[in-house]
Amino acid sequence: MSRRKQGNPQHLSQRELITPEADHVEATILEEDEGLEIEEPSSLGLMVGGPDPDLLTCGQCQMNFPLGDILVFIEHKKKQCGGLGPCYDKVLDKSSPPPSSRSELRRVSEPVEIGIQVTPDEDDHLLSPTKGICPKQENIAGPCRPAQLPSMAPIAASSSHPPTSVITSPLRALGVLPPCFPLPCCGARPISGDGTQGEGQMEAPFGCQCELSGKDEPSSYICTTCKQPFNSAWFLLQHAQNTHGFRIYLEPGPASTSLTPRLTIPPPLGPETVAQSPLMNFLGDSNPFNLLRMTGPILRDHPGFGEGRLPGTPPLFSPPPRHHLDPHRLSAEEMGLVAQHPSAFDRVMRLNPMAIDSPAMDFSRRLRELAGNSSTPPPVSPGRGNPMHRLLNPFQPSPKSPFLSTPPLPPMPAGTPPPQPPAKSKSCEFCGKTFKFQSNLIVHRRSHTGEKPYKCQLCDHACSQASKLKRHMKTHMHKAGSLAGRSDDGLSAASSPEPGTSELPGDLKAADGDFRHHESDPSLGPEPEDDEDEEEEEEELLLENESRPESSFSMDSELGRGRENGGGVPPGVAGAGAAAAALADEKALALGKVMEDAGLGALPQYGEKRGAFLKRAGDTGDAGAVGCGDAGAPGAVNGRGGAFAPGAEPFPALFPRKPAPLPSPGLGGPALHAAKRIKVEKDLELPPAALIPSENVYSQWLVGYAASRHFMKDPFLGFTDARQSPFATSSEHSSENGSLRFSTPPGDLLDGGLSGRSGTASGGSTPHLGGPGPGRPSSKEGRRSDTCEYCGKVFKNCSNLTVHRRSHTGERPYKCELCNYACAQSSKLTRHMKTHGQIGKEVYRCDICQMPFSVYSTLEKHMKKWHGEHLLTNDVKIEQAERS
């Protein structure tokens, strides 16, 4: 198609712009070099600079038609011309001789892609910026009816069918609607070969209302979604793409900006736009306007266009996620395409920016993100699509999509600040609650899904947090300890079994060991009991994991070494005691160095008592004698890492009831080996013992250092009575509910923490190491019902246990008489009553329910919470009164 200058210029909005030829429809190319101008808003937006009218030239017979007689030209093409014309060959044949005329030169210029389906032959011309527009190509044999629209498919360029494609409006020029589907507003009538109009009028249901008034091009268009009128189809297309999110065309790149019409901003939407936007979801398949959504999937499945050439069109009202077009996450080829098409990139980035940040839009993404670690849905089309298509159509699933997995992002370019992660990344997709750490979100999500991954190996109990499983395991330890026998020193070894410190069967020990190994994993994060403490405990745990040195006493190595050293135990006896004995030997070697560094080896009292202890242990070899009298001194001196006497009841399961002497300057190697031999020989009499967690090594050193300071202050302190041992204390308890905590510093343990009920008749009492159970007293009289039967938590007094038990039962016996407040502690009720008024202070009463409050801000909160609707009604009445 070519255009020539003629006598009188005519506005392009009065005539059609497109000449269809066989299987290719070319857009009209403007003649003048100075570009395009918009003279009036009622026009289509294009203005020809030349003074002559345009002509339509048939590519086969070279017959010229005035642009106003485009219908005659269409009939001419339908009845006489079939097959490809020379003008079409000039576009596709790169080896053809250069065109001789200026119009032919413009016609041969490569088209730019506008988001439509193309043939494989035209694929070479799509990605380079050009100066023309290549509209959609379709061929339908015979006239098209509305009922046939959903089943339409394009025909290849080599098809022998006679060309019947007709474009009668700018919507067809941009490939939005099927080319042979006429608009009712265009008044398309069948034209005979001589140029006379036919009798019938071709009509189709389309949401376009126009004023014909004898014009070929309608003067107004009305959007079916928001009922907004437009003066030209070009403005309507812009409105549909930029406002409603339809993906219709691509904006040209910077190389073609000189030929791009300067467009005005579309009129604003009406107030009913948002409410009517979901209308398109209910349009039938036969509605032509619905083809804006159906065109992509229809053409994509046709075999004539290859596989994966153009991904499917996204849903109508789903804007592309912003992070898909983040420059930091694009590959090199996609970044090059963004550089070539910045306007299209910016347009996609502008689509509905507020909808992206809405939490309601995040459910499907979060679910796909969670499921992406295990399974990935197959992509829509096989193979890797065109980079520009993947850039501008990020809705198609692909292995690189952030929707499907959460791999670490590639390193950011130097000097570029990384994009801030959205706040919703750690928000619950079920209730919207936000969390500072991912592990807290994982634990919280289980409350919605009902997942309970932590299961007890001894019963049917299952829970969602490792900490709850730990408390549950204490109940099993407590029960297992009550079945143990008596020890050789005459005291019951399990009469006061502490949770986690009593003798355990092999399977219970294995379960506890597995749990501890799981709990010590820093990648799991904290699992707090209350939601309010989740973030704080997470931060503390992270800091602890970062600052904690690597310990040689890992759980796996301890178990492995224990099994190797305990291989000589007969099958009828549990081997846990032998494993713990070998472990204690290694700990003695490692921690003995710590005690020497602390200065205890230089004290004469330390050396004398140690020598007497080793002498008696080597001479008698009696397990009972080892745990009596002065034998307790070395254990007491050693603190948390020395030779532990069998009577060390605050943590009897952490070390075996045999001496594990420490090396000192005055003691040689033979004595140490003798003690080891005695320990191994007496392992048959030892009950199973638990293992020390690796995180307690540092605390052991602290206690040893504090012990050295204490001995230097009072070097003549004797430890024949374990009841006066500075280490035999379990006074660590929190200020909230009296539950035992390991928060007391070592200095307090030494100076003021003496407890007469925390030791036993045997020496060597040592503080609890923070193992599976708190440091409870081990004597018979110390055994009280201060252990929670629900979670195994231990309390110093029964009143705290009573209050704690209500957190499990939900009981709230203390109720306020003025409101519906109820609590589990009387102190909380007393504190609450102060909010209703205090003696000698002014009282503020609610005007509606007459409830008293001592603080006015509390009254305001009460009004908003309980009388919000009433206040809103009063505000409306006050505003109406003020206006009147």
From Swiss-Prot:
The organism's place on the tree of life at top rank = Eukaryota
Q: Where in the cell is it found?
A: Nucleus
Q: In which tissues is it expressed?
A: Expressed in brain and thymus. Expressed in splenic CD4(+) T-lymphocytes.
Classification from the root reads:
Eukaryota, Metazoa, Chordata, Craniata, Vertebrata
Report the principal subcellular site.
nucleus
What's the protein here called? B-cell lymphoma/leukemia 11B
Q: How does it assemble?
A: Interacts with TFCOUP1, SIRT1, ARP1 and EAR2. Interacts with EP300; the interaction is detected in activated T-lymphocytes, but not under resting conditions.
Q: Which GO terms describe its cellular component?
A: neuron projection; nucleus; SWI/SNF complex
